[in-house]
Amino acid sequence: MSEPEIKVGKTSSALFDRAPMAPSMPGGRASSSHGLSVTDDIDARIWERIKDHPCFSEXAHHYFARMHXXVAPACNIQCNYCNRKYDCTNESCPXVASVKLTPDQALRKVLAVASKVPELSVIXVAGPGDACYDWRKTVATFEGVAREIPDMKLCISTNGLALPDHVDELADMNIDHVTITINMVDPEIGAKIYPWIIHGHRRYTGIAAAGILHERQMLGLELLTKRGILTKINSVMIPGVNDTHLVEVNRWIRDRGAFMHNVVPLISKPSHGTYYGLTGQRCPEPFELKALQDCLDGNIKLMRHCQQCRADAIGLLGDDREREFALDQISTKVEFDTSKREAYRKLVQHERGDQLAAKLDANKAVKSLGSSGTLAVAVATKGGGRINEHFGQARELQVYAVSLKGINLVGHXXVEQYCLGGIGEKATLDHTIVALDGIDILLSSKIGDCPKKRLAETGVRASDA
């Protein structure tokens, strides 16, 4: 019997539409994918736990999708960068959802998505409030998913205030991945970020509130580490508030066993209705974010591919499909078909084998050149270790360091799409040029003469692969 046809995001069942990055680039150098198998800094046991999780593995986010079930609207803290919205379809940032779901509605939606999105590997509760504070709804949702799709990964995102009360239950439910947002370890700084919290049926403000939050976050992280649960720490970079302080946050979480640190830029616009947005708090520039990430690199694994997802996000990172699954368009009885999901997993396994072979060949080719120095190479890719994205359509670029040590993925550069029908192209390209500071070579499937010339003027050699 033939295997079912698989649709992969915007690509076909071939997964990706070009051959793996070949061991040749301008100047005779090579490019390859990194992290497609057991990497140098992750042992085999950890790799097995993260290889299908798009947020905990950079390699996985090209193959696997996540779904956030927006079942937890209640929250126990107020953040100056957050305005929880439950009926918003336009904004793309955390704490925003188009509709609140009951656990039963969420399960129906999960089954519908899993039937049509074979890449789906993770169901998370990330709000729009707090998963641990709105605990009964979170648990009811996870129990339903575990019953219907036993091999689906479950994870939560939390501010950490109520987390210590539920670590044992998380472990009992086989939840292996938890994200905590930690923006400070100094209550004086925390008071500038959090105006109030609710804890023990009491409302606290100012430094007292931030002090309680800090203690609970550290306790929760320590308890998760003791239970062997992988923890990712999200930190919002707020210029002039906690930007330099995040170095200290990084040290604290590393010492308490966090697996990964994800530093994301503040999203702050007046239209969002947040305190920071209304008071004019600026967002960090791309070069400021990169400088901070580079400063932290080496202390702990860094996530550099975060898309700062909505509380109801569905699909591959950067390719949200939530609007395809409006609740009123989903049948009251959904038949979940596992065949497409199983076939897709086989394709990914084969693809990863090809990528590992290509990586080994490319590293050999680079080392045989014998030249010294390191090249920084940015690649426009839809994933799979292939140069298959038009420069003007790219939302992010993978950055590789190419040297005698081999080819290693060192980060991501978030960029805006350049091809917008002639609207704002110059401003967008200016932003991209800033993001490409320090890059020697840009590889894409196609690039126009105008952006190629502008990049050349800044010292970036652009090539159509």
From Swiss-Prot:
One of its GO terms (molecular function) is 4 iron, 4 sulfur cluster binding. Pfam families: Nitro_FeMo-Co, Radical_SAM. Residues 1-36 are annotated as: Disordered. It is an enzyme of class 4 (lyase). InterPro entries: Aldolase_TIM, Di-Nase_FeMo-co_biosynth, DiNase_FeMo-co_biosyn_sf, MoaA_NifB_PqqE_Fe-S-bd_CS, Nase_CF_NifB, rSAM. [4Fe-4S] cluster 2 binds at residues 306, 309. GO terms for biological process: nitrogen fixation. Disulfide bonds: none annotated. S-adenosyl-L-methionine binds at residues 81, 129, 181, 233. Its cofactor is [4Fe-4S] cluster. Its EC number is 4.-.-.-. Keywords: 4Fe-4S, Iron, Iron-sulfur, Lyase, Metal-binding, Nitrogen fixation, Plasmid, S-adenosyl-L-methionine. Residues 61-312 form the Radical SAM core domain. [4Fe-4S] cluster 1 binds at residues 75, 79, 82. The keyword Iron-sulfur applies. Involved in the biosynthesis of the iron-molybdenum cofactor (FeMo-co or M-cluster) found in the dinitrogenase enzyme of the nitrogenase complex in nitrogen-fixing microorganisms. Catalyzes the crucial step of radical SAM-dependent carbide insertion that occurs concomitant with the insertion of a 9th sulfur and the rearrangement/coupling of two [4Fe-4S] clusters into a [8Fe-9S-C] cluster, the precursor to the M-cluster. PANTHER family: FEMO COFACTOR BIOSYNTHESIS PROTEIN NIFB (PTHR43787:SF13), FEMO COFACTOR BIOSYNTHESIS PROTEIN NIFB-RELATED (PTHR43787). Belongs to the radical SAM superfamily. NifB family. This is FeMo cofactor biosynthesis protein FixZ.
